[in-house]
């Protein structure tokens, strides 16, 4: 498997575990709000065929590019306005619950039919509200709590 230090925040660990527990072989993955690119690098190492990351912070893009290079992971990172217009088998977003709420339509639009949306950066008490928000856009594709760790949760669901 992929080894990362125990320093990772619980939300990053939850997302890493989700990626690890699902077969990414030949799949496309978008790391939305990629930060240093840890999830994108992991997805590539776990067999994803195409991996993109996006972040609003230009310094994050630089850090992610660097981390992908040193880990020999073929992943590309973009500012949101430069992102190619495509859909992905897996969209993972480890950001905070407020931006996740506002980004619901944008994130859902990036998931291929039958693909998965994986969200973290969410406190247990925020889960219900986010499940409702995403459900209001896609009643046919409910998200649910996949796992929790130290008061943080990971929501995931298949988008139909």
Predicted regions and their residues:
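Conserved SAM/SAH cofactor-binding pocket of Class I
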Residues: 2-84
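Short glycine- and Lys/Arg-enriched binding-loop motifs that mark or flank ligand-binding interfaces
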Residues: 1-3, 29-33, 111, 117, ...
């Amino acid at each position: 498997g992929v080894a990362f230090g125990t320093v990772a925040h619980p939300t990053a660990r939850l997302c890493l575990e989700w990626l690890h527990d699902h077969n990414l072989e030949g799949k496309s993955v978008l790391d939305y709000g990629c930060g240093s690119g840890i999830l994108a690098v992991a997805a590539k190492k776990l067999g994803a065929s195409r991996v993109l990351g996006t972040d609003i912070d230009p310094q994050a893009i630089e850090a992610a590019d660097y981390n992908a290079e040193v880990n020999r992971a073929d992943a590309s990172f973009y500012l949101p306005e430069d992102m190619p217009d495509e859909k992905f088998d897996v969209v993972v977003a480890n950001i905070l619950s407020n931006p996740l709420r506002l980004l619901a339509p944008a994130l859902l639009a990036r998931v291929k039919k039958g693909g998965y949306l994986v969200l973290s950066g969410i406190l247990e008490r925020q889960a219900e509200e986010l499940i409702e928000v995403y459900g209001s856009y896609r009643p046919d594709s409910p998200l649910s709590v996949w796992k929790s760790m130290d008061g943080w949760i990971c929501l995931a669901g298949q988008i139909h």
